[in-house]
C-alpha cells in the first residue's frame, strides 16, 4: 500500500512509518509533492511508485523525491533475464544522471 493524501501521510507517520511510498505517483504529480513536502517532516524519505521512470526521474528529484519503485517499466511477464538486466542497467544509469 501507499499514500496519496496528507491525511494518509500523517496516519502512516503516526503509525511509525520511517518513509512514505506514494502510489500511484502519477496521480500526485510533482507540484503536489512540493506542496506536501511543505508540511511533512523534512527528514521523511519519499518514494515514488507508479508512473515514474527514466523520463521523469529528474523532475521528481527536483520536487523532493528520495527514491523510486519501478515495476512494469522493469519487468513484464515472459521477458528474459537478459532483457530485464539491460532495462535495469538503463534505469540505474538514468537515475544516476538525474541526481
Where is each model-derived feature located?
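Generic, ordered loop/turn and secondary-structure boundary motif
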Residues: 4-5, 53, 75-76
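Active-site beta->alpha loop and helix N-cap motifs at the rims of alpha/beta catalytic domains
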Residues: 1-3, 8-24
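Glycine-rich phosphate-binding active-site loops on the catalytic face of alpha/beta enzymes
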Residues: 9, 21-29, 63-87
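Alpha-helix-loop-beta-strand connector modules within alpha/beta enzyme cores
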Residues: 1, 28-54, 85-99
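Catalytic cores of alpha/beta
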Residues: 7-15, 38, 42, 46, ...
Amino acid at each position: 500500500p501507499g499514500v496519496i493524501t496528507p491525511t494518509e501521510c500523517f496516519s502512516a507517520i503516526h503509525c511509525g512509518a520511517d518513509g512514505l511510498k506514494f502510489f500511484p505517483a502519477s496521480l500526485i504529480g510533482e507540484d503536489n509533492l512540493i506542496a506536501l513536502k511543505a508540511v511533512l517532516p523534512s527528514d521523511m524519505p519519499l518514494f515514488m511508485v507508479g508512473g515514474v521512470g527514466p523520463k521523469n526521474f529528474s523532475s521528481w528529484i527536483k520536487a523532493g523525491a528520495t527514491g523510486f519503485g519501478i515495476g512494469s517499466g522493469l519487468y513484464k511477464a515472459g521477458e528474459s533475464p537478459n532483457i530485464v538486466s539491460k532495462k535495469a542497467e538503463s534505469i540505474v544509469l538514468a537515475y544516476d544522471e538525474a541526481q
